Design a protein with these regions (language model features):
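Trp/Gly-enriched beta-strand/coil motifs that build multi-repeat beta-propeller-like domains
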Residues: 1-286
Length: 286
């Protein structure tokens, strides 16, 4: 479990395997957290996108060095992912209906992808929808629940897309691989009935699971390490005297519920595999 605290720019990570705690100051108020594996070492790096100067600040886990490319504009939406399949997260932004990607294979910024996709009112839902190991440019249309992704597996021919109607107006799209087949599934969380609706790509079966409350914030991730995305929510403070947030996780490996307090009201959930081996002072983590 991990959160980024906008008020002080600190990341708080709880390792669910060994129980270790990590606190890392990285970022400042106004930044947007963009964790990813920017150095290709298999660990998520602490990273933020700063709209004021359109600069990405990445603290590389492999050597502790800072990677800080300028990419985008102040009003852009960051959409990092591994768009070239080299095992490293690429910096990318979405501006209105156009995606701008700087490929990590060429850090000079000369190798880029510029792709118009969807409408400005669509939501970005980048993921690997064709299972080729590359992040696909994709959008979700809130008005009718339509997903549309541009397949990266067909780069030399006429671009092909995947279109799926999955969801309804008001649903919240969730990006994850819930069946562990290395293909992003179509999934939504509907606050009105608190049901997760997932179309599993492995066998095209439907999974419906009631989980959470209408005011919860979805936070899917692989919390039990079985290679499948787990259904999870973060519940903000429930009383005026308790400012802590509570995580509720449904483990895909055994169906057991896990719950734990982690973070404060106003923190941004950033779950993932950080695997920090050093434990920083963490007196205010929770």
């Amino acid at each position: 479990m991990a959160v980024w605290r906008p008020s002080n720019g600190t990341w708080y990570v709880y390792n669910m395997v060994d129980g270790s705690l990590t606190a890392q100051l990285w970022g400042q108020a106004g930044d947007k957290p963009v964790p990813g594996d920017y150095d290709g070492d298999g660990k998520l790096d602490f990273a933020v996108f700063r709209p004021s100067n359109a600069t990405w600040y990445v603290l590389r886990s492999s050597d502790g060095q800072v990677y800080g490319p300028q990419w985008g504009q102040s009003s852009d939406e960051p959409v990092p992912g591994d768009y070239d399949g080299d095992g490293m997260t690429d910096v990318a932004v979405r501006r209105a209906s156009t995606f701008y990607v700087m490929l990590s294979a060429d850090p000079s910024g000369n190798s880029t992808i510029i792709q118009q996709w969807g409408n400005a009112s669509d939501l970005a839902v980048a993921g690997d929808y064709d299972g080729d190991g590359k992040t696909d440019i994709a959008t979700y249309r809130p008005s009718d629940g339509t997903w549309t992704s541009l397949k990266s597996s067909n780069p030399e021919e006429e671009p092909t897309s995947i279109t799926m109607q999955w969801g309804a107006s008001g649903d919240q799209p969730q990006v994850g691989d819930f069946d562990g087949d290395n293909i992003t599934d179509f999934a939504t969380f509907r606050a009105s009935d608190t049901v997760w609706r997932i179309l599993l790509t492995f066998d095209n079966s439907n999974l419906e699971q009631q989980w959470g409350l209408s005011t919860d914030k979805p936070a899917p991730g692989d919390y039990d390490g079985d290679g499948k995305t787990d259904i999870a929510v973060v519940r903000p403070r429930v009383s005026e005297t308790d400012n802590h947030s509570t995580w509720y996780i449904l483990r895909s490996s055994d169906g057991v519920m896990m719950s734990a307090q982690w973070g404060l009201d106003g923190d941004i959930a950033v779950p993932g595999k950080y695997n920090r081996v050093t434990q920083a002072a963490c007196t205010n983590c929770q």
